[in-house]
Amino acid sequence: LFAPMIDWVISAVKESGIDDICVVKGFGAEYLDAHLADSCKTVLQSERLGTGHAVLQAGSFIEKNGGDVLVLNGDAPFIDAKTIYDALALHRKEGNSVTVISAEIDDPTGYGRIIRSADGSVERIVEQRDASAEEAAVREVNSGAFWFEGEALMRALNALSEKRASGENTKKEFYLTDALEEIKSYGLRAGSFTAQSADIILGANDRVQLNELNELARRRELEKHMRAGVSIPCTDGVIICPGAKIGRDTVILTGSVIKGDSVIGEDCTIGPDSLVENSTIENGVSFVRSVCYSSNILSGADIGPFVRIRPGSVIGKSVHVGNFVEVKNSTIGADTKISHLSYIGDSDLGTGINIGCGCATANYSGNKKSRTTIKNGAFIGCHTCLVAPVEVGENAYTAAGMSPTTRSQSPAQDRRSKRAG
């Protein structure tokens, strides 16, 4: 849903109350650095020697922070804060040195099976290729997520690394499942927390699996909003990103996409076929077949169809912006009408203005951009080109086809009315 999988994982971790986060990077490390910036610490795994080796690269981070350590896969986006929190509670209650977060699934083919002892503790994790027929029938599988006691984890990982270096362990790689067995060999306890949702095990190794994750995430978000009072009569093509907030009794129609941290109020109609990105739309707005980027639309506005609102714009209360209008970096006052085929760029419009068909604010001279000001109650005739910097005074009008070019505090032309006699 327009966000890297790692963002979903980090969001769940932070929601669970964990602030100290370290990401182990490998292939494409430069892209990860650019994306994460300074939001969390990163360390590089220069050689791909397994998940155990990857976590060992964060050894100084683990030793510095101490205590219990959560290890997650960066490409398993459906881990959630409740699962993390509840697994930690079990980890501490049972006195485990390692607790694997598991899931029960109908078809465990390809996953490591959780083999438990008679007392309920984890005896080992058996991979598909090594499982006996009895073990292969086990439906509880390893999600790849673990809680570790930090000191036990580092002791195990260092031991596994030394065994690999000395040739005692002939395997090229070592894994977190190996760390579990190493910790068990110290006489310490291993446990398992079974998550409520099996979705936590899901990851993506190709575009088909990525599409499946996106569809599952999309359905989750839509159901969340529908349960909160948002109407989505037909969900085809509707995408709502996790950061979006939508008020009750708003209707989202087919083909609409709501991205980023957009906020939409109550009793709105969005769509069909609309895009709202990082924008705020207040109550009672109609937004039809239009796009809005990083802007604010105030209550009661009527937008569309085929309107493009570019960043930095504020559309006032009860404003009408009709078909084939573009607004860019402009403020439009309440009750103003821009009905069709116009461009309003780098402009400040007052209240109660009427913009005729085919009007434009010419904001670019070829080397700089300037602003246009239209004051309250002005009437801009069709095919007017306002060449910035220019000002149209209060209650003034321009005749059809005019091209005002001068800044004036006085009206461009006073309105006239017919009088008897």
Give short role names for the model-derived ranges.
Residues I114-S117, W147-F148, A204-N205, C241, ...:
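Short beta-strand-to-turn element immediately C-terminal to the catalytic PLP-Schiff-base lysine
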Residues D236, C241-S286, S290:
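Phosphate-binding active sites in nucleotide-utilizing proteins
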Residues T42-V43, I125, S192, I232, ...:
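Generic preference for hydrophobic
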Residues C22-V23, L70-V71, V98-I101, S192:
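Structural beta-sheet core signal
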Residues D19, E30, A34, D38, ...:
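Conserved core of the sugar-phosphate nucleotidyltransferase
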Residues A3-A89:
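Conserved N-terminal catalytic core of the sugar/cofactor nucleotidyltransferase
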Residues N278-T280, S286-G421:
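Glycine-rich hexapeptide-repeat left-handed beta-helix
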Residues R139-I246:
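Conserved alpha/beta core of the MobA/IspD/sugar-nucleotide pyrophosphorylase nucleotidyltransferase superfamily
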